[in-house]
Amino acid sequence: LVISSKVYWPMSEDINDRGLSRKHIMESIDKTLERLGTDYLDIYFCHRPDPETPIRETAFAMHNLIEQGKVLYWGTSEWESWQITAAYEICERYGWHLPKTEQPQYSMLWRDRVEKQILPATEPRGVGLVVWSPLAMGMLTGKYDNGVPEDSRFGREEWAKKRFLTDENVERVRQLKPIADDLGITRAQLALAWVLRQSGVSSVITGATRPEQLLDNVKAAEVELSDDVIAQIDTIFEPEDAS
C-alpha cells in the first residue's frame, strides 16, 4: 500500500491556504494526515508549480517534512523540465532530500511533452514518472468509436472533448482494436501496458467508475508487449507537438 497526497490548490478562501509556500505546505500536511488517518505519507506531490513561491522555499519545506517523518518522499506534478531541474539541483547543493517523482499527463495521444521535455530532465536523475490520464480521458478504450455517450466524460467536460476527440484520433483508436484482439486483451489494457513499458515510467494513475474497470486496468501490469507491437503502435501514434 502506497499512500500519497498533493498540495497546491486552494483549500479555502484564505489567501494563504493555497500554493507551495512553506506556510501552506506545513499546515496542509497535518490536515492531510488527519483526514487520511495516518502518521505519514509515502509520497507528497507538489501538484503544480507555484510562480508566487521560490522553488528553494518549496524544496526546503519538503525536506523538512521528510526530516520530521511526516513524508517519505516528495515529488512534483505537471512541472516544467527547467523547474524539475532547478528543484533537483537546489536540493543537491544544500544536501536536502531530492525530489523522486514527477506526475505528468502521458498517453499514446499525449506524448511529445513527456518524451521531448520531461524525460530528458527526469531520467538521468533517477526521477520516476507516475503518469496520469494514460487512457487519454477514456479515449483509448474505444468508448468513443461511435460517438459520445451521454454519461461519458466527454459528454460532461468540453475541454477534455476538445483535447482528444477528433476524427483522426477516433480512427487511430480503432486501429488499436486488431492489435489488442491479437493479444487477447482490451484496448484499455493495451494503452496502459504501453505506458508502463515506456522508459522512465514507474507507475500509472487510473480512474474507474465500476469495480470491473479497475480489475481490467490492473491486468495491464501482466501484459508484455513485443518490440513489433510497440512499432505498430508508434506507426499509428507518431508523436506530435503537445500544446
Where are these regions (language model features)?
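Active-site groove signature of glycoside hydrolases
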Residues: L33-P54
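Outer-envelope exported proteins of Gram-negative bacteria
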Residues: V2-S4, I43-F45, T76-S77
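Beta/alpha (TIM)-barrel catalytic core signal, keyed to glycine-rich beta->alpha loops juxtaposed to Asp/Glu
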Residues: P51-T235, E240
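Short, small-residue-rich loop/turn micro-motifs
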Residues: S5-V7, Y40, R48, S133, ...
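A short, structured active-site edge motif that brings together acidic residues
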Residues: L1-S12, E102-Y106
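Short, acidic/polar
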Residues: G19-L36, I84-E89
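Short, basic/glycine-rich phosphate-binding loops at helix/coil junctions
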Residues: K6-S12, Y40, R153-R156
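Active-site mouth loops of central-metabolism enzymes
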Residues: M11-M26, H47-R48, E52-T53
